Every structure is written in C-alpha cells, then in structure tokens.
Amino acid sequence: VDTGREQAKRVVRNGKKETTTLPLCWTAGANTVVSDQDQEPIRIWILTCWWFLTVGILLGSWWAYHELGWGGWWFWDPVENASFMPWVLATACIHSVILPLLHSWTLFLNIVTFLCCVLGTFSIRSGLLASVHSFATDDTRGIFLWWFFLLMTGISMILFYQMKQQASVRRTYKKEMVVARSTLVHLRHSARAQPRPVMLWKN
C-alpha cells in the first residue's frame, strides 16, 4: 500500500501539466496527503489544468467568431457545453483544495472532472452529439472511449468507496481516542480528589 501511495505522489510531482489525469492520480493516493508540502503540488496541478482548459475554451471561441463568422463568441453548442462542464467542476476543485483538510467531496470532484473530460471526448469523437464542431465520420471510433469511460468510472468509484471507508475508520478511531483520553483525565483528577486519612502522629 505504501508503495502505491508513493507512486501516486511521484506521478503528481513529475507528470504532465496539461491533463486532468494528475488530480485523478492524486485522488488514488489522497489519503496520504496530509501536509502542506504535499498539498502545494496538488494546487499547482489543478490550477494548471484549469488554465489550460480555460485557454482552450477562449481560443475556441475566438476561432469560431473570427474564422466561421457566426457573429458571436458562445452559442451553448453541445460541444461547447461538453468543454464547459469540466471547467465548472475544475473551478469547484480549485476552491475545494484551498481548504487545509481533505474532504470526501474534494476527491469526488476530482473523479467527476476527469470522467467528464473522457465523456466529452467520447461524445464528440463518436458522433453522438450533432454539432458543427463535431468532425467524426466513423461511429465505431467511440467504442474504445466508451469502454475506457466505463472502466475508469468503475475503478474510480471503488477507490472512492475505499477511501471513504478508511476516512470513517480514522474519524471513529480519533473520537474513541478523545473519549478514552478524557476518561483517563477524569479518573486521574478523581483519584487526586479522593479523601485521604490524615496522620496526626507518627509511630
């Protein structure tokens, strides 16, 4: 288990900056990220992914406005929405990782952001969405992406469930330790406060 955690950390530190796979890899080893030294690379990766996605959306809008001459920057096209959904989720991830503690919904946001990117790629490349941005000519090309999406969804949900179980065990253990420590403190003070016989003379 420790080897897998260290591998997840190395992927976060040494991976490519332009992919949402890095936050997902961090999610796989998120139960080890407890210090500020480990959380700082996470913030950098998520911000970098968010900036790349933002620049991509802006360049796509500029290209559509100047090259296609539609007379507007944004038309809520299905393909535009497919890129906008991961951007909204990535924005939520940025706000969630600012907190000093790791929460289950932070892990869930990272998982859903990556899965939305895969699902958006599948929708565009398979021709499932009818859009002027879609240049798919072969519907069978999306089969691989669909199976990859299902596989990653299953693995991510299993990891998320295991992490939630580990987090609940740690919270229960901490509560039990607090109660036990408080009980010991009360017993110690009670022992000190017990009446003791007073010696009026010495033998």
From Swiss-Prot:
User: InterPro entries, per this entry?
Assistant: Cyt_c_assembly (IPR002541), Cyt_c_biogenesis (IPR003567), Cyt_c_biogenesis_plant (IPR003569)
Q: What is the lineage of its organism?
A: Eukaryota, Viridiplantae, Streptophyta, Embryophyta, Tracheophyta
GO molecular function terms noted in the UniProt entry: heme binding; heme transmembrane transporter activity
Give the chief site where it resides. Answer: mitochondrion
GO terms under cellular component: mitochondrial inner membrane
What processes does the entry annotate via GO biological process terms? cytochrome complex assembly
Q: Where are the transmembrane segments?
A: 44-64, 143-163
Keyword Transmembrane recorded: yes
* Locations listed in the record: Mitochondrion inner membrane
Further details from the record: A stretch of 270 kb of the mitochondrial genome is duplicated within the centromere of chromosome 2 resulting in the duplication of the gene. The expression of this duplicated gene (At2g07768) is not demonstrated. It is also probably not RNA edited and therefore differs in all the positions known to be edited.
User: Could you describe the subunit structure of this protein?
Assistant: Interacts with CCMFC, CCMFN1, CCMH and CYTC-1.
Bilayer topology = Multi-pass membrane protein
UniProt organism field = Arabidopsis thaliana (Mouse-ear cress)
Q: Tell me which family the UniProt entry assigns to this protein.
A: Belongs to the CcmF/CycK/Ccl1/NrfE/CcsA family.
Assigned keywords, A-Z? Cytochrome c-type biogenesis, Membrane, Mitochondrion, Mitochondrion inner membrane, Transmembrane, Transmembrane helix
Reported function = Forms a complex with CCMFC, CCMFN1 and CCMH that performs the assembly of heme with c-type apocytochromes in mitochondria.
The name under which this protein is listed is: Cytochrome c biogenesis CcmF N-terminal-like mitochondrial protein 2
